Amino acid sequence: MNYTIALSIAAKATAYLQENEGSMSETEVVVHVSALHLALKSIADHNSVELPHLP
């Protein structure tokens, strides 16, 4: 998975989980947590890439 895409997926999955906390079905939770897990694994696999610094 492309590093930039992985960052985007991680951000979107995290935002969705936070915005919909308490109102999601079990399936929605599993899908979004799985996407977040795969994205974070991809980011970790690219650990030689320096993450951009946030302001």
Where would I find each of the regions flagged by the language model?
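Short, charge/polar-rich alpha-helical segments
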Residues: M1-N2
